[in-house]
């Protein structure tokens, strides 16, 4: 079927092992596994705290594959850099809710919500990430309902609300 994709656990395990050999200075390694036009599937491995980030125009859908860690969600992101497409990274994430993560956990992070992935001390955290374009109701962006945000840098999305 056009657009169909099946990623088996054995294949993810192979990618996980390869990523572990390619850890960069930012304590992470990543690989785009599949591209589907306006969204993609990535595998990320972290062996140290990830930089805080927020995405104005994308939802992060995450499935923890291996390891242990914590997701910090929400709070205030300060001192970050905003790049193309509303991608904000770096700086300091103050406050936010903490969620323990383990293999099999499934996470939906709405657009514009600051977050950071923190592996457990001395451990790693590997997760499958689906970056999906955010679609806003007409009341949240100019134009017609169902329109994808285009670099507006803001939504009315709040932590704990969908």
List the model feature ranges, each with a label:
Residues 1-56, 142-153, 159-162:
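A short, N-terminal "cap"/entry segment at the start of jelly-roll beta-barrel domains
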Residues 43, 71-73, 117, 127:
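Short hydrophobic/aromatic-rich beta-strand segments that constitute the beta-sheet cores
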Residues 56-76, 85-92:
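Short, conserved beta-strand element in jelly-roll/cupin
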Residues 80-102:
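An anionic, turn-rich surface loop/hairpin at beta-sheet edges
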Residues 100-121:
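Conserved metal-binding segment of the jelly-roll/cupin
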């Amino acid at each position: 079927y056009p657009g169909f994709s099946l990623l088996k656990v054995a294949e993810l395990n192979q990618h996980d092992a390869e990523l572990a050999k390619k850890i960069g200075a930012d304590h992470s390694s990543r690989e785009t596994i599949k591209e589907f036009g306006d969204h993609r599937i990535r595998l990320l491995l972290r062996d140290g705290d990830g930089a805080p980030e927020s995405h104005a125009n994308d939802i992060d859908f995450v499935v923890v594959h291996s390891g242990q860690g914590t997701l910090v969600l929400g709070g205030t992101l300060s001192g970050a850099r905003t790049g193309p497409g509303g991608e904000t990274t770096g700086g300091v994430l103050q406050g936010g809710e903490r969620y323990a993560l383990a293999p099999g956990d499934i996470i939906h992070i709405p657009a514009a919500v600051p977050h950071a992935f923190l592996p457990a001390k001395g451990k790693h955290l590997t997760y499958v990430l689906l970056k999906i374009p955010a679609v806003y109701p007409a009341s949240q962006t100019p134009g017609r309902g169902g329109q994808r945000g285009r670099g507006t840098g803001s939504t009315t999305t709040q932590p704990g609300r969908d």
